[in-house]
Amino acid sequence: MTTRIKEIFQTGQPDQSVTVQGWVRTKRELKEFTFLEVNDGSSLANLQVILEPTLPDYENVLKTISTGAAIAVSGNLVPSPGKGQNIELKAAEITLYGDCPPDYPLQKKRHSFEFLRTIAHLRARTNTLGAVMRVRNACATAIHSFFQEKGFIWVHTPIITANDCEGAGELFTVTSLDLKKPANFAEDFFGKRAYLTVSGQLQAEVMAMALSNVYTFGPTFRAENSNTSRHLAEFWMVEPEMAFCDLEGDQDLAEAFLKYIFKFVLENCPEDLQFFNERIDKTVLSTAENIVNSEFGRITYSEAIELLEKADRQFEFPVEWGVDLQSEHERYLAEELFKKPVIVTNYPKTIKAFYMRLDDNNKTVSAMDILAPKIGEIIGGSQREERLDVLIQRMQEQGMNPDDLWWYLDLRRYGSVPHAGFGLGFERLVQFMTGMTNIRDVIPFPRTPLSADF
């Protein structure tokens, strides 16, 4: 039976017989014996394996096993006299599954993230990307745990849709038509234009109107031709929707949600977060602890504008009531003024989506964004417009044809209730958690303009 390396470091005892399987990170030959550093992906730390000349076929083992090779090692655990770990494995038997030639790209040196993106099929074998994937896994586990503990139902919304939820028009078209001929979408597979989804929100609202509290967690797509460190064409979104909920309840849930995730990852990935704190961003741990222990600030958009207008600095983008907050404004509020996450609410209706509930002043909507230090907006949400006549008017104001979303309007015709929800970009969360500067390095296979090789 194979034992994972993480388990060995947690509960392994001297003289315990184990078998480990993994990949050789380094090989160091001395006169009397050889050291291998082996990693199986379960932990940041490698397990040191000692090969002695008494090992069967020792000379051949030394010739065939190199950095990158896949092996299985059986033997007994022994106390380690060296620094860095308390226990190591004295090999009694070793099996080579797959050798690795000298042109293996991942040798014992630090590689740039730019280079690693060109070998995305191998980069998870590095310390940094392996740690990213473990933190990503912990974040996903925490998300499901949070909502399941609160009685939410996970619903699966469609990947292919005829709707543009965000109204941005940056959509990937799905078609079975011959692209060499003029397109007549009435003859296409669905009889109309179809797209890859940009959000599961509208369909999640449908489910919330029957199941009360639901959430989605799946891939979304934007055909936005942005080559930046903040944009991906394919990314994952978490989108809860709650029936019988208003803007205040939406804020409360979002704050509790973020705190839960950060606390979970702090408890379950301490070595990985310590690695990021030492190698990537020296504020990773303090930022995570700040999220968990701080009561988030709460201000309206109008109050935010007043604070920004009083700021003793010149912003690249001028501030006035009615403009959307830019990243520099969001980070100033979170990093310098509040020094913790802050929730900004009640934005002008002209800069927000049609489905957000119109406030009584007819100027703002019941929207909310959570702004976090270092990254800016991390969650965006709102109370949804539950009044049929107001929703139709808002759609018309934005140049939409209400008939295109007849089924969405039906939710307001048949048993409408106040409801609210929010969206969290999963990769943005992982980027924030790890301190990684480029969002392409927190997803296994980034999809960006001119990049879909893997």
From Swiss-Prot:
One of its GO terms (biological process) is asparaginyl-tRNA aminoacylation. SUPFAM superfamilies: Class II aaRS and biotin synthetases (SSF55681), Nucleic acid-binding proteins (SSF50249). Gene3D superfamilies: Bira Bifunctional Protein, Domain 2 (3.30.930.10), Nucleic acid-binding proteins (2.40.50.140). GO terms for molecular function: asparagine-tRNA ligase activity; ATP binding; nucleic acid binding. The lineage of its organism: Bacteria, Bacillati, Cyanobacteriota, Cyanophyceae, Oscillatoriophycideae. It comes from Microcystis aeruginosa (strain NIES-843 / IAM M-2473). NCBIfam families: asnS, PRK03932.1. The gene is asnS. Pfam families: tRNA-synt_2, tRNA_anti-codon. Its main location: cytoplasm. InterPro entries: Aa-tRNA-synt_II, aa-tRNA-synth_II, aa-tRNA-synth_II/BPL/LPL, Asn-tRNA-ligase, Asp/Asn-tRNA-synth_IIb, NA-bd_OB-fold, NA-bd_OB_tRNA. GO terms for cellular component: cytoplasm. Homodimer. It is an enzyme of class 6 (ligase). Keywords: Aminoacyl-tRNA synthetase, ATP-binding, Cytoplasm, Ligase, Nucleotide-binding, Protein biosynthesis. It catalyses: tRNA(Asn) + L-asparagine + ATP = L-asparaginyl-tRNA(Asn) + AMP + diphosphate + H(+). This is Asparagine--tRNA ligase. Its EC number is 6.1.1.22.
